[in-house]
Amino acid sequence: MSGLGIMVLTLLLLVSMATSHQDGGGKQATQRDAINVRRRRSITRREVVTEECEEYCKEQNKTCCGLTNGRPRCVGVCFG
């Protein structure tokens, strides 16, 4: 293979590596944004929790994450 052919293949390889690396950064940013949204939702939802719900879930050694269909939703950890 000629020197020019090797240079072209090397350039294509470098370009593909650079673009895949940029895509990975975009995915990380998207995941980070999704985590931030979940955190905000769980904080907002915690404000709606009533004392009755907290007491009911405390008996089960769980955390009250709000009401679902009028009934307390008790889980180990609240996620948005």
Curated annotation (Swiss-Prot):
A single cellular component GO annotation: extracellular region
InterPro entries in UniProt: Conotoxin (IPR004214)
Intrachain disulfide bonds: C53-C65, C57-C74, C64-C78
Residues carrying Phenylalanine amide: F79
Signal peptide: 1-20
Subcellular locations according to the entry: Secreted
Annotated family: Belongs to the conotoxin O3 superfamily.
Domain comment (free text): The presence of a 'disulfide through disulfide knot' structurally defines this protein as a knottin. The cysteine framework is VI/VII (C-C-CC-C-C).
Name the UniProt record assigns to this protein: Conotoxin VnMSGL-0123
Phylogenetic placement of the source organism: Eukaryota, Metazoa, Spiralia, Lophotrochozoa, Mollusca
